[in-house]
């Protein structure tokens, strides 16, 4: 898997004799080091390869599996944050030519959509499925935490965009039929039920949501 991709900006080895902390300090000071960019690209691929493979029981979480109980004492307890963190873990999957490393995330989204269908109906009276800012290994899909950042029913749409990205890169028609389209269709049904028509312009608009990063 790792050998599938080579990335060079022409000067990859120019500063390779330096420790990485010194290279990083040079870049922060305004110096150029294209090789460090290539190194970080490959490091991201390495992290995903080492933590997310076909048949992995779960996708990559905030801290990974090896926390020595530390995660239990953190505010986010090594969960799944669907507002950006989980997505960021998988941004490298397709651009890094690692489509099979994406698969544990899709298995998780399918499970999440089952729980999210009940939340869509019970909480919003809507068809389809939804999920909010935080989730866990059991597919938790309801609102949690502060309403300032927890009431984010479009988190499901954000995480589901990954199935479309996978299809765009792979053009796998069977994946589109069996996995991507059902998830996208059901989530779109939720959005169509959830949105309201703005009388000022007749556009469909979202009812109040709390976008988690807005306060920052």
Feature names for model-found ranges:
Residues 1-79, 98-119:
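Acidic/polar, glycine-enriched structural segments that form the non-catalytic walls/loops
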Residues 45, 49-53, 63-67, 71, ...:
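An acidic- and aromatic-residue-enriched active-site/binding cleft used to recognize and process polar
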Residues 40, 82, 199:
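Extracellular/periplasmic catalytic domains that process cell-envelope and extracellular macromolecules
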Residues 42-43, 146, 200:
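Short, well-ordered loop/turn elements at secondary-structure boundaries
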Residues 207-216:
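Single conserved hydrophobic/aromatic residue that forms the stacking wall/gate
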Residues 198-206:
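Flexible glycine/proline-rich, aromatic-decorated loop/lid segments
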Residues 75-196:
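Aromatic-rich carbohydrate-recognition surfaces in CAZymes
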Residues 66, 131, 206:
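Short clusters of hydrophobic/aromatic residues that line enzyme substrate/ligand-binding pockets
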């Amino acid at each position: 898997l790792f050998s599938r991709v080579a990335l060079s900006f022409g000067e990859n080895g120019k500063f390779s004799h330096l420790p990485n902390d010194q290279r990083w300090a040079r870049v922060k000071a305004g110096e150029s080091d294209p090789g460090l960019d290539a190194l970080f690209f490959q490091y991201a691929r390495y992290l995903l390869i080492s933590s997310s493979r076909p048949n992995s029981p779960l996708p990559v979480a905030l801290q990974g599996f090896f926390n020595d109980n530390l995660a239990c004492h953190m505010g986010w307890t090594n969960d799944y944050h669907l507002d950006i963190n989980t997505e960021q873990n998988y941004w490298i999957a397709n651009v890094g030519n690692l489509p099979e490393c994406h698969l544990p995330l899709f298995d998780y989204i399918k499970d999440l959509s089952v729980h999210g269908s009940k939340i869509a109906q019970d909480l919003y009276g809507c068809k389809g499925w939804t999920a909010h800012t935080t989730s866990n290994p059991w597919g938790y899909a309801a609102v949690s935490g502060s309403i300032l950042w927890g009431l984010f029913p479009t988190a499901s749409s954000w995480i589901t965009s990954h199935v479309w990205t996978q299809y765009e890169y792979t053009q796998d028609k069977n994946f589109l039929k069996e996995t991507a389209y059902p998830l996208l269709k059901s989530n779109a049904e939720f959005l169509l039920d959830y949105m309201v028509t703005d009388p000022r312009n007749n556009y469909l608009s979202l009812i109040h949501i709390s976008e988690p990063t807005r306060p920052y």
